[in-house]
Amino acid sequence: MRYRYIFWDFNGTIIDDVRNSLGCVNDLLDRKNRPHITLDDYYNYVETPIIGFYRHILPPEEINFDEISKAFHEDYGKRIVNTRLADGAYELMHSLKEQGVHQYIVTSNHIDEVTDLVKRFGIYDCVEKILGADNTLSESKTQRAKELFDSLNINRNDAVFIGDTLHDLETANTLGIDYILVEYGHQGKKLLRSFGAYTVADLKGVEKILYDERRVDFHTHSTRSDGTMTPAELVQHAKNVGLSAFALTDHDSVDGIEEAQNEAEKIGVEFIPGIEFSAAEDTEIHIIGLYIDPRNEKLLKTINKLKGSRKRRMEDICRKLRSLGFEITHDEALLIGGGHFVGRAHIAKLIVQKGYCNTVQECFDKYIGLGKPAYSEKNELTATEAVESIRAAGGLAFLAHPHQTKYNLNQLEELLLKLKAVGLNGLEGYYSEYTPEHIADYRLLAQKLKLAFSGGSDFHGAMKPHIAMGTGKGNLNIPYYVLDNIKDIKSSQNS
């Protein structure tokens, strides 16, 4: 079992009441001599707070929300006898209880109404707490969920929110936990997926994810950039640490992909060819490419352009370090990189070897990090060019570790909108060094801009010994459904 704590939405998730709600809405429209809406209309219009839904179907002068809400709940109460549990809900919730999984219901509906239904359907003993509204307004569900989550003091990797709407996705993102959205609820598959969300058809799909302990990592490096494992060693390490799939995303290089692909086929690890482009706006930007064609002409042209730029930049860093009194040469750093590649991490390792600093991180913090005295700007590739090169190679493009830029959330949103216009698919929603605030901020931003998210450890081997492949600092656990979502996006992109 992947999760130990499950937060359930109620309406449209545990109970299948969409047609009841649609009937109530059309009864209201009858009373106002307005045409009925269809189920597709309902899927497209439902939102939270619910008053937004009525703005889609009624003119402003006919919206008296207190009156509408009272009438809806009276009509819904009459239809309660027709409400039923979603297929498989009883069996799944009881099975989870038997396995010691903690289950909670968080709903926008009145708590008494929900409690009565939960008892009626025989699942009351499965849940430890029901959190609902104490009036008829559909609001504050997310806040109730957050207060409960914070009070439990649990690991985010152990929790999941199961729901059926974008509001449920927002709640999960606010908590910084995984989500599962069902397609039979109050918002359809088309709308949910347009926001980059992954959906399943029914509770059998939910159960499959709950029991699927496969893990993935979309951000790793080999000796073909600044990692310390060869591509083949990296594949073997992925298998050893229990990953089902991973991406090799060397900096500005595809040189290790063929070796990694061959090894992955031999030992049965699912491999994703990737790259991490280093680019510049008014700050340093990294763009991850997944499922790229490493032979693509435009991609290779961009990489060749960067090779010359990288060498000039590393030589400039070495010159600046020498001006600070360090005896450092580019050729020495190249030896550290195994003769393939020189990055700042290799220079930092050389500095440590020569006794100028105690750790690689100290080198970055004092000398070669952004804004430090030996830092050298990148100016050969824009983020737009990076995204365009990835997309030209048939890949998907994701903004890597946005917290490492100097952007605040508003500036980050502007960047993402700009890059989305040229093909950006998403950003990293999982990362080894994210705080809980980072997780919530970036996932909510992805949802707002209809972007998907990837994620990864940023594993470098001994170059970053505190970062483990697949688990980061012990805080990373990327479920396989994230890869399923990326595959679906890839398939849609190709069709």
Predicted regions and their residues:
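Active-site neighborhood of HAD-like aspartate-dependent phosphohydrolases
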Residues: 1-44, 58, 247
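Conserved Lys-Pro-Asp/Glu-containing loop-to-beta segment of HAD-superfamily phosphomonoesterases
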Residues: 2-5, 141-169
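Metal-dependent phosphoesterase signature
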Residues: 55-94, 101, 364-378
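Short, acidic loop-to-helix structural element flanking the phosphoryl-transfer center
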Residues: 78-105, 111, 115, 142, ...
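Substrate-recognition element of Asp-dependent hydrolases with the DxDx(T/V) motif
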Residues: 89-119, 131-133, 247-249, 396-403
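Acidic, Mg2+-coordinating phosphoryl-transfer loop and its flanking beta/alpha structural elements
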Residues: 160-200
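An N-terminally biased module of ancient metal coordination in phosphate/nucleic-acid-related enzymes
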Residues: 211-284, 368-369, 381, 387-388, ...
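Extended substrate/RNA-proximal surfaces in nucleic-acid metabolism proteins
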Residues: 263-417, 476-485, 489-493
